């Protein structure tokens, strides 16, 4: 009998062998010959997905779980390149940026301050509109997941350790804020995973709610935190027993598949029971820490029809659940449970929780599509009052409690929304805050939607109620300065940019560019919504082509991922965050390409730095940034048709002076080392508008990089 060669085996047999190989062995095997290096083997999705999730504890993403190339690239770069960015309202230091000097926002939580008169203040930044890296992350190791709570940002490391910044409950008086990542603690006797591995405390999956965090450990324990400074409580139930994972399969009754911390409830998907809901538990602040390490939850409610398991024969599921199907994913909203099943259907159930009743109503199917359409749902995501439903053809539906779920249970449900920018654009996940939300797309970029309360920066698009935000498509309204995106932004979305150089570029151009007087009339036209929408779209195309503009043909890394590649996005309340892979080598090259070559200066004088230094000393010691932003304030007033402020003061820079903004002391034209940016001679764009109107000016018309979009009939309100 002849020996069987490895390559003689059917590919299905090879797939059964792969899970027993570590990554080094798998790569070595698939590199031995051409036959094994074929994409369907070398980039086998189940292998790389499992490797990434088991090694780094990265949460599964159902929409791309079969994308082997993505999982392979993620595995390679997670080792060295993951960064945590946050933005939005920094109440209780929930962004993790610490205390530093910054230019204050013209809008405070209480109303409008003097436009543009932003003085440097040393305190925690109240509003952050541009993504900024969290501080103190490097010492934690590899970050696998991050989630925002109502007043916190929480991180999971590849070792299974949880850390948080801010406070769990911003309405409680006894919770001091944590400005830097602090470990979430366990009862006495259990180590934090940063100390040593212990299955009972190493976290496999976690969820951040409004004011509490739920986590599922490797051993199958459910842990609940309601205070940054106090140990967790283990959750146990009176009505059923949970299974410790050791020596038990995932089909064993009592096995916990997932936990979700909702707006005001906790929930878990448990084999044999279904989706179980309970009131979040809290540790008594006055009780000694050593007295209590677990809580027996007396009152629970089970979502009907959610106990069916295709691979389980050890118990008899309820008859209704067989038709509903096996739960694939679920979310816990303010008043509802929403879940999708393996049959491609989505169901909702109302949570009834009062003194008379603790129950979850019978489920109702959420209709997808229109008459004649058949949609197969693959995932549900959401929080608080908003949700999204994904289908296998790339359709993404969005909805909320008031407009949709209330109608489903009371009268007639209005059709779910389909935002144009989310359809067939490879959306992986959607993260919802109170009034804003973000979409993560498979190519690694994030788009923003909704409203930015009090110009808090939650959309991550830049600006604080000023032209920098307006040029990204934000219209500021009311006394509090709420920012709402123009309708045009729903066609392709507005991307979040991580490069600081783009912020400099935006600041320079929105201040009039090289000749503010020449651009004055064009800038004033932005008060009209359609003009603002078109100009913001032009800037969107230019900013999205940043690597093409400044990186040549070598801006993609060897695995074709972008310089900034977002792995996940999260949002809650008025703030947001993202876990991003950053290729520092590529980022530095692009950063350098944004700068002009140093200019040879006359003898005894460096080209621009010495001149700037002399002018600083003569300007009443006001400081570089103060004078730059005073000038920006004059631009804002001028843009709005208001009188200039402090026209006699030493810091006043006349916008009519075309040379004012190429001076290195003014923001956006020159880098800290004195070198000018390549856009320091650019003008504010001049466009031919969709209605046939030509923007006034003396400069050449600006060309559309990707062509002017057709908004008519595709975007509501245009």
Question: Where would I find each of the regions flagged by the language model?
Answer:
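Conserved core positions of repeat-based scaffolds
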Residues: 86, 152-155, 164, 212-215, ...
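Solenoidal tandem-repeat scaffolds enriched in leucines and small polar residues
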Residues: 201, 206-353
């Amino acid at each position: 009998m002849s020996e069987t060669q490895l390559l003689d085996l059917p590919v299905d047999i090879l797939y059964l062998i792969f899970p027993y190989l570590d990554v080094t062995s798998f790569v070595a095997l698939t590199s031995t010959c051409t036959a094994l290096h074929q994409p369907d083997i070398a980039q086998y999705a189940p292998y790389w997905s499992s490797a990434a999730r088991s090694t780094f504890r990265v949460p599964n993403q159902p929409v791309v779980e079969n994308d082997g190339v993505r999982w392979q690239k993620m595995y390679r770069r997670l080792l060295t390149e993951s960064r945590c960015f946050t933005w939005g309202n920094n109440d209780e230091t929930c962004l993790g940026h610490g205390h530093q000097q910054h230019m204050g926002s013209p809008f405070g939580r209480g109303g409008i301050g003097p436009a543009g008169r932003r003085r440097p203040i040393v305190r925690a930044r109240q509003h952050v509109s541009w993504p900024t890296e969290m501080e103190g992350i490097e010492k934690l190791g590899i970050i696998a997941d991050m989630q925002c709570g109502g007043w916190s940002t929480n991180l999971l490391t590849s070792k299974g350790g949880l850390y948080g910044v801010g406070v769990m409950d911003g309405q409680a008086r006894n919770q001091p804020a944590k400005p830097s990542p602090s470990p979430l603690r366990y009862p006495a006797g259990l180590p934090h995973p940063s100390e040593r591995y212990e299955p009972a405390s190493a976290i496999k999956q976690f969820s951040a709610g409004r004011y509490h965090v739920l986590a599922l450990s490797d051993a199958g324990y459910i842990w609940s935190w309601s205070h940054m400074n106090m140990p967790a409580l283990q959750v146990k139930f009176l009505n059923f027993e949970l299974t410790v994972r050791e020596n038990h399969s995932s089909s064993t009754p009592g096995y916990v598949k997932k936990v979700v911390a909702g707006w005001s409830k906790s929930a878990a998907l448990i084999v044999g029971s279904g989706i179980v809901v309970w009131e979040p538990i809290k540790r008594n602040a006055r009780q000694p820490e050593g007295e209590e390490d677990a809580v027996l939850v007396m009152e629970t409610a089970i979502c009907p029809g959610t106990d069916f398991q295709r691979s389980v024969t050890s118990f008899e599921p309820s008859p209704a659940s067989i038709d509903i199907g096996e739960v694939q994913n679920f979310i816990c909203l303010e008043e509802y449970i929403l879940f999708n099943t393996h049959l491609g259907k989505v169901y909702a159930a109302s949570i009834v929780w009062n003194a008379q009743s603790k129950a979850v109503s019978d489920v109702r199917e959420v209709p997808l599509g229109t008459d004649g359409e058949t949609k197969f749902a693959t995932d549900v995501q959401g929080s608080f009052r908003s949700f999204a439903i994904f289908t296998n053809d790339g359709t993404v539906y969005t909805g909320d409690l008031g407009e949709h779920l209330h109608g489903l249970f009371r009268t007639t449900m209005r059709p779910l929304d389909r935002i144009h920018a989310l359809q067939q654009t490879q959306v992986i996940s959607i993260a919802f805050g109170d009034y804003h939300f973000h979409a993560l797309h498979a190519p690694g970029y994030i788009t923003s939607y909704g409203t930015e309360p009090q110009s808090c920066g939650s959309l991550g698009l830049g600006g604080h109620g000023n032209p920098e935000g307006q040029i990204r498509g934000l219209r500021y309204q009311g006394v509090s300065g709420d920012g709402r995106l123009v309708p045009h932004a729903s066609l392709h979305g507005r991307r979040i940019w991580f490069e600081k150089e783009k912020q400099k570029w935006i600041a320079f151009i929105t201040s009039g560019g090289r000749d503010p007087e020449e651009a004055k009339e064009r800038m004033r036209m932005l008060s009209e919504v359609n003009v603002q929408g078109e100009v913001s779209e032009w800037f969107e195309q230019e900013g999205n082509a940043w690597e093409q503009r400044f990186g040549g043909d070598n801006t993609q890394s060897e695995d074709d991922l972008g310089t900034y590649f977002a792995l996940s996005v999260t949002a809650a309340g008025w703030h947001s965050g993202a876990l991003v892979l950053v290729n520092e080598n590529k980022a530095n090259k692009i950063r350098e390409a944004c700068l002009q070559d140093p200019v040879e200066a006359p003898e005894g004088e460096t080209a621009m730095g010495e001149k700037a230094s002399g002018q600083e000393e003569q300007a009443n010691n006001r400081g570089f940034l103060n004078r730059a932003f005073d000038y920006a304030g004059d631009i804002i007033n001028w843009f709005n048709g208001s009188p200039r402020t402090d026209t006699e003061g030493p810091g006043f820079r006349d916008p009519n002076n075309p040379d004012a903004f190429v001076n290195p002391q003014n923001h956006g034209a020159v880098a800290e080392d004195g070198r000018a940016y390549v856009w320091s001679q650019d003008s504010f764009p001049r466009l031919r508008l969709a209605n046939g109107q030509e923007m006034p000016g003396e400069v050449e018309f600006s060309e559309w990089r990707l062509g002017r979009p057709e908004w008519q009939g595709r975007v509501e309100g245009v």
